[in-house]
């Protein structure tokens, strides 16, 4: 299943975000999923609006999403969660 990782990025240290998303990425791959990791597809330093455009294009092509624990504290992640749930993507627990 193609799974998109949703989590907070803005306001956190770049390296901390990379580590959190990468940990989830590895876990999901080990479970047999094809993973879309925003930290791998959005270049460091990209502005918020452009990053969201990149991420949302990728999200709508996925079948499922995985939510990091910090996702509910992020405007961008909440936007992604809204889109994912409205498109009836499966949440991977």
Language-model regions, residue ranges each:
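Conserved catalytic or regulatory cores that recognize and/or transform ribose-phosphate-containing ligands
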Residues: 1-93
């Amino acid at each position: 299943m193609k799974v998109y990782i949703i989590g907070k990025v803005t306001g956190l240290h770049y390296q901390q975000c990379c580590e959190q998303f990468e940990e989830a990425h590895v876990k999901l791959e080990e479970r047999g999923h094809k993973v879309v990791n925003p930290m791998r597809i959005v270049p460091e330093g990209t502005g918020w609006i452009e990053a969201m455009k990149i991420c949302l294009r990728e999200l709508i092509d996925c079948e499922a999403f995985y939510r990091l624990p910090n996702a509910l504290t992020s405007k961008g992640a909440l936007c992604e969660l809204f889109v994912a749930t409205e498109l009836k993507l499966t949440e991977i627990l």
